[in-house]
């Protein structure tokens, strides 16, 4: 597994430039084993207050699940713009997020954020790219998220044929 440790001063702007680079290995069935890590993350209280105001959240020291999601965004971009990632970032479609918030987190906590890929899945319209975020406080997992994104891939088959093939694979236990 490759680990990429980000500094506190890491800036995201370069990722938006890298996102427009064209690369597309549509035949890839594997995602790279890379984890992007940011340690000793401290909360900027002015940023938190602005976020809470914009979202019409009550002012609080407690970090919402959505704020924790935002904290991980730079790491998402770092992961998705690695040269080993087989797909172009532009054109990917967000499908869903599944968030588990295990323990209250406040602006006083120092956090470690880790973002990595899960196992690539299939979808009637392409491939599902899961991005897993884990946030730790004092070494304990406090937040976990799986963001599923679709990489559209034309297989030459109609959507119904692909769906039927996937359902057959599931019923037969995979092949």
Regions found by a protein language model. Give the residues of each.
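Hot-dog-fold acyl-thioester-processing enzymes
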Residues: 1-96, 156-175
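Generic structural hydrophobic/aromatic packing signal, biased to beta-strands
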Residues: 16, 51, 99, 133, ...
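Residue-level marker of positions within ordered structural domains that often coincide
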Residues: 56, 104, 152
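Hydrophobic beta-sheet segments that form the core/acyl-binding groove
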Residues: 96-138
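An exposed, glycine/acidic-rich loop-and-rim segment of catalytic or binding clefts
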Residues: 128-175
């Amino acid at each position: 597994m490759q680990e990429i440790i980000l500094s506190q001063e890491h800036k995201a702007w370069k990722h938006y430039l890298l996102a427009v680079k064209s690369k597309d290995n549509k035949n890839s069935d594997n995602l790279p084993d890379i984890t992007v890590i940011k340690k000793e993350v401290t909360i900027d209280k002015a940023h938190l207050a602005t976020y809470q105001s914009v979202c019409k959240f009550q002012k609080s020291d407690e970090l919402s699940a959505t704020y924790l999601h935002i904290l991980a965004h730079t790491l998402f971009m770092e992961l998705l713009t690695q040269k080993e990632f087989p797909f172009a970032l532009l054109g990917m479609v967000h499908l869903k997020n599944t968030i588990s918030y295990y323990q209250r987190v406040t602006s006083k906590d120092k956090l470690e954020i880790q973002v990595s890929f899960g196992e690539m899945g299939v979808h009637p319209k392409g491939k599902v790219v899961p991005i897993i975020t884990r946030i730790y406080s004092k070494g304990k997992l406090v937040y976990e998220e799986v963001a599923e994104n679709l990489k559209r891939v034309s297989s030459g088959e109609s959507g119904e044929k692909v769906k039927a093939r996937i359902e057959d694979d599931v019923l037969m236990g995979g092949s």
